[in-house]
């Protein structure tokens, strides 16, 4: 499966960019092996959802901590989503 984003890595940080034209079926529920901090660098109507929770809007400057093995997903908005991901060793 091809990732629904482009990514640039720099040490333990990665910049991911999602385009608004991404197919919604590619934005799947998933969980990560490591705890992550996600900083929103750019968002236009994108939302974030934890399993069994109501989606919340992602705004530029928001910082999320996603614990390892926690199901979550993003929901496409009207423009790009650009995030900075920092992974932590648990």
Language-model features: locations:
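Well-ordered beta-strand positions
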Residues: 39-41, 57, 65, 75
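Short alpha-helix capping/helix-loop boundary micro-motifs
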Residues: 31-33, 50-53
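Basic nucleic-acid-binding interfaces
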Residues: 44-46
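Short acidic-glycine-tyrosine-enriched beta hairpin
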Residues: 51-69
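Conserved short histidine dyad/triad with adjacent acidic residue
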Residues: 13-33, 41, 65-68
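Ligand-binding loop in jelly-roll beta-barrel domains
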Residues: 67-90
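Double-stranded beta-helix
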Residues: 3-9, 14-18, 82-90
């Amino acid at each position: 499966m091809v990732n629904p984003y482009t990514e640039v890595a720099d040490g333990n940080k990665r910049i991911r960019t999602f385009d608004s034209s991404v197919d919604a079926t590619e934005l799947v529920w998933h969980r990560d092996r490591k705890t992550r901090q996600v900083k929103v660098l750019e968002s236009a109507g994108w939302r974030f959802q934890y399993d069994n929770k109501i989606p919340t809007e992602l705004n530029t400057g928001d910082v999320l901590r996603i614990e390892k093995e926690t199901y979550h997903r993003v929901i496409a908005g009207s423009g790009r989503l650009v995030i900075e991901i920092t992974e932590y060793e648990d």
